[in-house]
C-alpha cells in the first residue's frame, strides 16, 4: 500500500491505485477507523470499508496551483484532533499522497506543535516523500502567519486592557 505511518495516530498516503479490498485490509491490519479523503474523484465506499459516516470526511479538491485548500485547514484539524481524542487512528489521503493530503497533515502538525511550515514539513517528510504544490505551501505559510497575528493581536489587546485597569 502507498501509505506511510507519520506518527502513532496519523497515516498519510495515496489510494489512487488501490482496490476497495486492498484498502479495507490495510485499514483492518492497522486499526484505522477514520479517513479524510481530499481529491477530485468520488467519495470512498465507506460501507464496504466498514467506516462509520461520522468518521469520514470528504473534500473535493484538485492538485492545481489555483486550488484553495486553506478553507479546510480548521475543519480538518478539528476532525483529526477529535478522532485522536476518541482513540482512533486517522488516514489522510489523496490520489498519490504527495501534495493535497500532505498539506493537510503538515497543517495539522503546524497547529499541534505551534511550529512553522518548514519544521512541520520536516516532520512529515522524514516519514514520507512529499511535495505539496507551491500554492498549497503559500496557503500553509499564510494560514500560519495569520494565526500568529491573531495571537499577537490578542496579547496586545490583553496588555492594553490590563494597563488601563
From Swiss-Prot:
Q: What does UniProt list as catalytic?
A: 94 (phosphocysteine intermediate)
On whether Hydrolase is a keyword of this UniProt record, the answer is: yes
* Biological process according to GO: negative regulation of MAPK cascade
Protein keywords: Hydrolase, Protein phosphatase
Under the heading Gene3D superfamilies, the entry gives: Protein tyrosine phosphatase superfamily
Under Gene Ontology molecular function, one entry of this record is:
MAP kinase tyrosine phosphatase activity
Task: Please report the name of this protein according to its UniProt entry.
Answer: Putative tyrosine-protein phosphatase AMV078
What is the organism field in this record?
Amsacta moorei entomopoxvirus
Amino acid at each position: 500500500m502507498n501509505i506511510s505511518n507519520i506518527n502513532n495516530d496519523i497515516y498519510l498516503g495515496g489510494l489512487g491505485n488501490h482496490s476497495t479490498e486492498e484498502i479495507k485490509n490495510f485499514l483492518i491490519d492497522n486499526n484505522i477507523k477514520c479517513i479524510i479523503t481530499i481529491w477530485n474523484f468520488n467519495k470512498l465506499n465507506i460501507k464496504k470499508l466498514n467506516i462509520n459516516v461520522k468518521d469520514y470526511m470528504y473534500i473535493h479538491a484538485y492538485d492545481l496551483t489555483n486550488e484553495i485548500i486553506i478553507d479546510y485547514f480548521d475543519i480538518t484539524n478539528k476532525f483529526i484532533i477529535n478522532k485522536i481524542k476518541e482513540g482512533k487512528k486517522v488516514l489522510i489521503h489523496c490520489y498519490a499522497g504527495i501534495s493535497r493530503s500532505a498539506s493537510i497533515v503538515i497543517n495539522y502538525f503546524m497547529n499541534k506543535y505551534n511550529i512553522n511550515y518548514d519544521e512541520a514539513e520536516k516532520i512529515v517528510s522524514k516519514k514520507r516523500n512529499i511535495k505539496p504544490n507551491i500554492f498549497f505551501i503559500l496557503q500553509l505559510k499564510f494560514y500560519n502567519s495569520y494565526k500568529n497575528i491573531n495571537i499577537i493581536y490578542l496579547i496586545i489587546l490583553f496588555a492594553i486592557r490590563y494597563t488601563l485597569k
